Amino acid sequence: MRPAAAPVVSVVTLLALGFAAAVAQAVLLREAMAAIGGSELAWGSVLAVWLAGIGAGAWLGARRGGASLAAFGPLAVMASTGAAVVLVRAAPVLTGAGAGQTATAWGGAWVWGFAVAAPALAGGWCFPAAAAGLAGPGGPALAYALESGGAMVGGLAFTFALAPGGAAAAVCVGAGVCAAALLASRGAGWLALAPLLAGLAVAGPAARGLAHAGWGWSGRLGELAAWRETHVQRLELAAGSPAAIYADGRLAASFPDPFGTVERAHLAMLLHPHPARVLVIGAADGAFVSMLRHPVERLVAVEEDPGLAVVLPRWLGPPAASAWTDPRFFLEAGDPLRLVGREKGLDLIVLDDGDPTTLRRNRTRTVEFFRACREALAPGGVVAVRVGVGDTYLAGAGGRLLAILAATLARVFPAVVAVPGDEVLLVAGREPGTVTVDPAVLLARWRAQGARDGDFDPRVVPLLVDPARAAPLQAFLHASRAPVNTARHPRAVLLAAALREARGAPPLLNAARALERLTPAVLGIAVALAAVLLLARGAVGAAFGMESGVIVGFASMGWWVLLLACWQETVGSVYGEVGALSAAFMAGTVAGAFGARRWLPAGAGTLAGVLGAGAAVSAAIAAGVPLAFPRAAIVPLLLLGGVLTGAAFPSVSLLAGGGAPRRGVGRGFAADEAGAAVAALLVGLVVLPSAGLAAGALGIAALEVAAAAALLLAASRRRR
């Protein structure tokens, strides 16, 4: 083998680095989301550490290391990502979580920070070191475009090829690609294919080994019988009976469950006198088996995850066999919003899909969805909403979550009745006076419907509705003054996620309550102070390279988080699509960087114009365009955001470097990633749940306008 020319090494290294970084980021985000039950709390925490690590690495790379050493950077990113995956899977053991419990975001933060930091530092250091091999005034733009191009390919490869195999398979194949690129850049010829083939060969065994090891580290009872990575979540099935199905590490269903699912299913069917047409959102617990004991004409169970719908008949086993051959029963895999809009004339809708602990789950707990449910109901129709909050203590975050969901339901329906229990059931009718939970009436309906189930004794009905407990619960809801939960302002998500995460972590619940009370006015004051600081820097004629880099990074990551939240809220899970959505953004950065290199002179004026255009993108998000037209708007907005980010980088690096290209690339990239890290932490965890989509996007727009004005002010000061 002979060494290749330095530019070739740099070009291949930057492409491979983008590929490795995209795969690593997608893998780590998926692992973090799965580790805490699919919660977007992972977005802010993991992305903040990832981006801060990249920024710190870029700062180091601006000073030390050459293109030859940087060629090993992409492989180092993938190798350290593999170690990070093992650490995250082992988090229950490392954090001392109870048997069968997942590590919480609070307790596992140090594990994630340690795991994510290594690949992030390696990736950040590699970028300026590799970019140093690209000489000429267009070097920074070319380096940014090459890295973004590799990231685009990596994101697409992850979503459409690597994600179904799981994290271990993605890491093995990704490492093989990076090793092949390293050998190819050194003229290895066909020998470069060897590590790629090796990665493909070990991907399957590595995935199986990691699945079984992770099951063992979780401390769950029994053996792992089956597992599956879907585009929505990670599914696991415990061996033996009853069937225990885990989704993202949490127990999703145990079937059969005569003292939970069976009682809840029969009670739901008694809420309507003649439930002929029934729609159930959420199928994992097999409640439909008990519901089919009633004289229904058509029962549709909706499972949002097509991967779970495929395995459900096999995983629930013989106790559910009768349902699959019942001509009245239909299992639909797909979007609950679309399916509710399609169904008409329903007598009963049961929302059995769990609390809004994520933006994806929040989709079926908003005013918008409840309106769709009301439109789908026949006259006299009833909707029942399961809430994972008990009625025994309502003073804390649980009571607040229940009050918000009840207020949201009451915004659409004339009256809401609460049924007490370990999990409160909220019931609403299409017309006033439709709903009754009188035990005598419910027992009369049981007899009239002629249902028979050896696992259910109708004499427990008075205990299930318990009028003595229902009265104070109803009084609590009437006295509550709670806001409603909407797609634009998902108030319920942070409370629900914190409740699930709060085992042994009261500070997390306190933080969630504090954030809920945080008004948009407080955030507006914070944005105004930041704008004043930017203008003050401009007034003294600062070079403004680092400051503008921070704002560009903050805006780009803010757009990414808000647009992914819109996708999660309207289209579905980003668990599998995160790579493709990231690829859309990276495709824009490639176009923006190449376009700026060819047509835009780097400098303060160009950067101010880019920031002004970015404010227009933020305004479109604030106006609700991605929520109103999700499939038509989200990907184009990601592309446009990427174009502006890529177009800004040459000017950022010029201003940050003061004439030294490598210093400018390193410092500009570090500033960009630092701003992105702050946005990941603030926009995802604070701004979106507390102030909503519009306020968050308008805040980003205000910062961009202030930065553009400060840039022009600083440039005019320096010309004097």
Question: How would you label these PLM feature ranges?
Answer:
Residues 1-441, 445-456, 465-720:
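Alpha-helical transmembrane segments of multi-pass membrane proteins
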